[in-house]
Regions:
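Amide-donor transfer/coupling interface in amidating biosynthetic enzymes
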Residues: 11-119
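Catalytic nucleophile loop
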Residues: 1-9
Length: 119
């Protein structure tokens, strides 16, 4: 999903240097540690050694969007899927993605973390 989001940002949002901070420095991190972008939408960069407590691991709830393909498939409003990663989609770009055709069809219960996308 993260690579699809990076490619979408490059080709549909025209963010040519869209990347993940997981790949190193430089570019525009569309994907990153939550601690890098969660302060009022502004980029905050900690050190690479400052990773304690940043991994989401195990089953996580995802609220499914009404009339989405994933909701039709699962036939449920909420599902649980296994998750093991510390890098997340920067939700500050959500509106731009949606205006260009991406559907965030599964979000964390607090609506801050995309779990499922549809193109």
């Amino acid at each position: 999903m993260q690579m699809a989001i990076i490619e979408f940002a490059r080709n549909k949002l025209n963010i040519k240097k869209a990347t993940s901070s997981e790949f190193g420095k430089g570019g525009t991190p569309i994907i990153g540690l939550i601690s890098e972008w969660n302060k009022n939408g502004k980029m905050i960069k900690g050190t690479d050694k400052d990773l304690g407590g940043t991994m989401r691991l195990g089953l996580y709830d995802a609220k499914l969007k009404e009339n989405s393909l994933v909701k039709k498939i699962y036939k449920s409003k909420i599902i649980q899927e296994r998750h093991r990663h510390r890098y997340e989609v920067n939700i500050n770009y959500k509106q731009q993605f949606e205006e260009n055709g991406m559907i965030f069809s599964g979000l964390s219960p607090d609506n801050k973390l995309p779990e499922i996308i549809e193109l």
